[in-house]
Amino acid sequence: MNGNKIYLCIDLKSFYASVECVERGWDPLTARLVVADPERSEKTICLAVSPALKQMGVPNRCRVFQIPKEIPYKMAPPRMQLYIDYAAEIYGVYLKYIAKEDIQVYSIDEAFLDVTDYLHLYQMTAVELGRKIMQDILDTTKIPAACGVGTNLYLAKVALDIMAKHETDRIAYLDEARYRERLWKHKPLTDFWRVGRGTVERLSNMGICTMEEIAHARESLLYKAFGIDAELLIDHAWGREPVTIADIKAYRPKNTSFSSGQVLPRDYEYEEGVLVVKEMADLLCLDLVDQGLVTSHISLTIGYSNQKCFEPAKGSTTLRSATSSNRRLLSYVEQLYRRIVRPGAYIRRITLTYTGVMTEDYQQFDLFSDPEETEKDVKAQRAAISIKQRYGRNAILKGMNLEESATTIERNGQIGGHKSGV
């Protein structure tokens, strides 16, 4: 167990929408604003909805057309770089109180803070320290925050997600006893961290609808239904979580992969899809070279247009030897694409993944690859990386990037698939 640990989980309320309100001089808690790209169709997803709209029943991740027509609101195009700048400034606020070793950033708008060793220093309770940090964030950036306080990471997160939003000061505390008292009978289970609809459906089929019922269920039945994941489910039902921030920071995954995915702006024909996949492969190659890595396995998933009910095309290929050469990898990717994709079907979604990634020190050459050609490829890629880092991602382009159906130039101006605003 965690002994006497105490954590804060701080969330920036409707972060993207709040930033846009602050930039316009509006109160983030009262303004009606959604963050969505007006250049896309009404089916585009709202990246954020301001708290005032949420109170009127507008869900956070709705599509634009789902917002009731009778509700007036302003739309702000996403500016991802601006949000990153605000998040960095708020991280600086955390560092005024807590060392970076005790901070775990969960997402751009949420972070866990291990405040165990700081309460005596500041002569405060965890709730008091949480309030102080929230106020500092508000004073520094005008962004409102909420805070969960808990005796482990799970309880801090649940206190934030389920309880803090009902408190006038947007802060709530949970320990194991309080959790069982307040939330054991809470419904729906999807309100709890890491409990998805599929899990709830399987639990419901077993006659289980609350955390209390999970806690008292026969463990053998839970393990039969959920396998090793039952251990996490049982721990969380009792309000237990043994993992600490130090454990998270010390964790190193056994396997590394590089992935790129995009939803195309329209239905793409077969040959147009080849172009986009090769662009994606080329950019992933640069990522490999930049980090001194090579890959030995490629996976590709193609989602077709909704015009026809085709199942997604999925395939993979293993390379004869690991490489980061764009010439070799683009050839493999194109062969894989032509092997799995229907020539007459329209394409809408593409996901490309390089797996079996290792450091280039382990690279071996086979009888069919030319070491000198590969080294020449990698040197050219390193030069391209250097130019892009100095002059911008569109400073050096290939002929294929200039074709009408290409997406690289536009995507280079995005962060996370959305406009950077720069």
Spans of model-derived segments:
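Acidic, metal-coordinating catalytic segment for phosphate/diphosphate chemistry
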Residues: 19, 315, 319-422
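Residues that scaffold, gate, or flank divalent-cation-dependent active/transport sites
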Residues: 1-108, 112, 237
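Compact, charge-rich alpha-helical regulatory domains located at protein termini
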Residues: 23, 143, 161-242
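DNA-contacting surface of Y-family translesion DNA polymerases
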Residues: 9, 201-346
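Short acidic, glycine/serine/threonine-rich loops at helix termini
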Residues: 19-22, 45-49, 155-163, 205, ...
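Catalytic palm subdomain of template-directed nucleic-acid polymerases
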Residues: 113-134, 163, 207
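Short, conserved phosphate-binding/catalytic loop or strand-edge motifs used
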Residues: 108-114, 151-156
